[in-house]
């Protein structure tokens, strides 16, 4: 903000012109920091910066100047990538730190699982055994239905009460599987082939 006895703003000083009272650069480029405007002028040009500032509302101009100064400094440091290089570097660093955090959390979880009391692991084994028995029972019921459709005599044996147990014993399961294989070996498919 030029006037009698006051020094011109950094922009007017660098461009060697008289600083008017309504100079758009004066509030943002003070005379005591000439490097700030010099770098912005070098990268963007004074006329482009002036146009940008005039298109913005007054309350956003200070933030715009700060962004222009940051981008100009980044462009001088890295002429190819500018501030995009810094952003990419930081995003890459965030990704690496997130991976390290995930690995650390997985290690903590493993250590916690190793330090659990053996009672809980015994309880889990019992639950697995019960699930295994339920699976065998379910498999037995499926085999019974298949056998009932294929062999009326075996269905009669089931309905007459020869197999009254709710839980299938291993020997009865093996007997049923052998009977099914003998009845129609071509219809049997293995789950593991």
UniProtKB/Swiss-Prot annotation:
GO molecular function: DNA binding
Tissue expr: Expressed predominantly in roots, and at low levels in shoots, floral stems and open flowers.
A GO biological process held by the record: leaf morphogenesis
Pfam family, one: LOB
Domain LOB, first and last residues per copy: 7-108
Other remarks on this protein: Gain-of-function mutant pck1-D (T-DNA tagging) shows highly epinastic leaves, reduced apical dominance and sterility.
PANTHER family to which the protein is assigned, alphabetical: LOB DOMAIN-CONTAINING PROTEIN 12, LOB DOMAIN-CONTAINING PROTEIN 4-RELATED
Family stated for the protein in its record: Belongs to the LOB domain-containing protein family.
Protein name: LOB domain-containing protein 12
Organism from which the protein derives: Arabidopsis thaliana
Gene: LBD12
